[in-house]
From Swiss-Prot:
<keyword id="KW-0456">Lyase</keyword>
<dbReference type="InterPro" id="IPR011051">
    <property type="entry name" value="RmlC_Cupin_sf"/>
</dbReference>
<protein>
    <recommendedName>
        <fullName>L-ectoine synthase</fullName>
        <ecNumber>4.2.1.108</ecNumber>
    </recommendedName>
</protein>
<dbReference type="InterPro" id="IPR010462">
    <property type="entry name" value="Ectoine_synth"/>
</dbReference>
<comment type="function">
    <text>Catalyzes the circularization of gamma-N-acetyl-alpha,gamma-diaminobutyric acid (ADABA) to ectoine (1,4,5,6-tetrahydro-2-methyl-4-pyrimidine carboxylic acid), which is an excellent osmoprotectant.</text>
</comment>
<comment type="similarity">
    <text>Belongs to the ectoine synthase family.</text>
</comment>
<comment type="pathway">
    <text>Amine and polyamine biosynthesis; ectoine biosynthesis; L-ectoine from L-aspartate 4-semialdehyde: step 3/3.</text>
</comment>
<dbReference type="InterPro" id="IPR014710">
    <property type="entry name" value="RmlC-like_jellyroll"/>
</dbReference>
<dbReference type="GO" id="GO:0033990">
    <property type="term" value="F:ectoine synthase activity"/>
</dbReference>
<dbReference type="GO" id="GO:0019491">
    <property type="term" value="P:ectoine biosynthetic process"/>
</dbReference>
<dbReference type="Pfam" id="PF06339">
    <property type="entry name" value="Ectoine_synth"/>
</dbReference>
Amino acid sequence: MIVRTLEEIEDTDADIKTENWRSKRIVLAREKVGFSVHETTLYAGTVNDFWYANHIEAVFVFEGEGEITDKATGETHQLKPGSLYLLNNHDKHQVRPKTDMRTVCVFNPPVTGREVHDENGVYPVIVEDEEEAAS
């Protein structure tokens, strides 16, 4: 059994900070459970273009408000506490938080925590090697 708190993750290598968002990686690929879980805060007034070409992501909003636009169709959905969006088709999307928006994100395949969005907003697939995963 693994039990973690957000406080344990803060200011570690599992706490990723950018100008637009902060993501605390709670469960990562090294746990070998087939998914990763993150608590991510997207900052008010930012514009965030993402495309998870190599991952499926589910995002549950539990605080704040914003909107998401499907970049292929132009369809926009309002996001508020209790909203969930599932990027089941590797959808290119844009998230625009109106207020700081706190979310819980689940990725499959799991991320390692070392991924960086490329110029298209894509995370590469990084596979944990056995030795690294054991540490």
